[in-house]
Design a protein with these regions (language model features):
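Active-site beta-strand termini and strand-to-loop segments that position acidic
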Residues: 70, 94-97, 220-221, 246-250
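Active-site-proximal beta-strand elements of phosphoester/diester hydrolases
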Residues: 1-9, 98-110, 142
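Structured beta-strand-rich core segments of catalytic domains in phosphoester-bond hydrolases
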Residues: 37, 42-109
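Conserved beta strand-loop-helix elements of the APE1-like EEP
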Residues: 60-75, 193, 205-225
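Surface-exposed cleft-lining segments at the edges of enzyme active sites
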Residues: 81-82, 107-123, 158-162
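N-terminal, active-site-proximal structural segment of metallo-dependent hydrolase catalytic domains
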Residues: 1-47, 51, 57-63, 78, ...
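Metal-dependent phosphoesterases centered on the DNase I-like endonuclease/exonuclease/phosphatase
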Residues: 51, 125-210, 214
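Active-site beta-strand/loop signature of hydrolases that rely on acidic residues for catalysis
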Residues: 7, 23-41, 101, 130-151, ...
């Protein structure tokens, strides 16, 4: 099964940049989107053979997630069931016979780390959700997790040490999550590869490949040997992020 995750940084804008053709060419079983910035009824974008599920932020033009799938789920849930976290459309969970699929758009800690304390609370609560799912069946987690985990995952680690997405605190939360029974699929197959998934729109960052790897597929440790492919599609434009992929044998 082929899974794609992409922070589209505004789906309306991305649709204007060849999104529909890219979607069809990737031909995924599951296509997860973050930062859709959509409101309900704003865009009717359907693809033959796919069902879609949407979680919208209450604030207009902000955040939001979606999943297109060729496989009808047993159950769908939105958010993590914690009032504090469930106003920004950041999580969708699909349940299947053999696994859960969770797509997530993790809150950015923002300039001057204004939201870092909130981010720490989010991380702990999100980890609890994933562990509760993992106790029932394996979990596939994808999305913009807004952290470059190790120095290999960011072009300029030293100058970004206290910037949102590369603080010691955020990186440690990712370490704790992985140690609790999850595998970073890309690093599992490509332990030494330097590839990024996000580039600032400023300073010609993408042209210079001054990027960050902040988009992930994590899987429960017990299915890591079912990973057959893990890719970062740096060739695909349309957003400041590029799509990431994992292929799993189920």
């Amino acid at each position: 099964m082929k899974f794609i995750s992409w922070n589209v940084n505004g789906l309306l804008a991305c649709v204007g940049k060849d999104f529909e053709n890219q979607f069809k060419e990737l031909d995924a079983d599951f296509f997860c989107l973050q930062e859709t910035k959509m409101q309900e009824g704003q865009l009717d974008l359907q693809f033959e053979g796919y069902e879609s599920y949407w979680n919208y932020a209450e604030k207009k033009g902000y955040s939001g997630t979606a999943i297109y799938t060729k496989h009808k789920p047993l159950n769908v849930s939105y958010g993590m069931g914690v009032e504090e976290h469930d106003h920004e459309g950041r999580i969708i969970t699909l349940e299947y016979d053999q696994f859960y699929l969770v797509t997530c758009y993790t809150p950015n800690s923002q300039t001057e780390l204004k939201r870092l304390d909130y981010r720490m609370t989010w991380e702990d609560d999100f980890r609890k959700l994933l562990k509760s799912l993992d106790a029932k069946k394996p979990v596939v987690i994808c999305g913009d997790l807004n952290v470059a985990h190790e120095e290999i995952d960011i072009k300029n680690p030293k100058t970004n040490r206290r910037n949102a997405g590369f603080t010691d605190e955020e990186r440690e939360k990712m370490t704790v999550l992985l140690n609790d029974g999850f595998t970073d699929s890309f690093r599992y197959l490509h332990p030494d590869e330097v590839t990024y998934s996000w580039w600032s729109y400023r300073f010609k960052a993408r042209e210079k490949n001054a990027g960050w790897r902040i988009d992930y597929f994590l899987v429960s440790d017990r299915i890591k040997e079912q990973i057959t492919e893990a890719k970062i599609h740096t060739e695909i434009m349309g957003s400041d992020h590029c799509p990431v992929e994992v292929d799993l044998m189920f």
